[in-house]
């Protein structure tokens, strides 16, 4: 049994690259980490073929919070958070994965500060903190939006 981490975003857009950064820097037993760029739907077949019990999606999300704050975003609140770089809305992707695979999907948003010149210090600190939370499996440390 394993879990899958999907890092979503675009590094060319500053803080929008935090999901990709987390995916590239996360390694832990029982996890498969995938850098999805801005197209997590391209990995639907891989997720379906896996024995994953949990899928965690990490992305920059405009939630109206201070830069670097992170939240678990329930599926009924996805519309309240802004995700600007995806071709398919994350809500549709998540619903499809849950219905076809029957896995638990957790969406973690990190509030961006800026969308230019690399990942900002506050957002990078949040990404590093999230790596540790993922390794511990202690999702309860993250507030729900």
Residue spans for each PLM region:
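N-terminal catalytic or cofactor-binding beta/alpha core of small enzyme domains
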Residues: 1-112, 117-145
């Amino acid at each position: 049994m394993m879990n899958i981490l999907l890092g979503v975003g675009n590094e060319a857009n500053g803080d929008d690259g935090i999901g990709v950064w987390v995916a590239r820097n996360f390694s832990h037993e029982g996890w498969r980490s995938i850098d999805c760029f801005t197209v997590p739907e391209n990995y639907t077949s891989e997720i379906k073929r896996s024995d994953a019990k949990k899928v965690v999606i990490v992305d920059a999300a405009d939630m109206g919070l201070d830069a670097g704050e992170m939240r678990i975003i329930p599926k009924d609140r996805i519309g309240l958070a802004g995700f600007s770089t995806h071709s398919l809305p994350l809500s549709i992707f998540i619903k499809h994965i849950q219905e076809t695979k029957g896995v638990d999907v957790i969406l973690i948003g990190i509030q961006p500060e800026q969308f230019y010149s690399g990942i900002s210090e506050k957002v990078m600190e949040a990404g590093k903190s999230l790596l540790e939370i993922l390794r511990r499996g202690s999702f309860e440390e993250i507030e729900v939006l």
